[in-house]
């Protein structure tokens, strides 16, 4: 599975939008930045459709999905953006309220 398969099922989160998480799904995809390696992608099924999260949020869910479900399902998350100087690009993070 690659990231395009994820993008066909889930949308990129809109910055500043509030999403209520109903269910979680964890997928492993080919890493487009590191060929031959894989990365985890967390798909959050929300009240506004499916959105995806990568990096720390997906890694934490991969380590303990039961804990991720306990922390996220039924909660509202807000997507925000920050600039990562090491990667030299904007990344998305989520605030849980």
Predicted regions and their residues:
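Short beta-rich binding modules
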Residues: 1-97
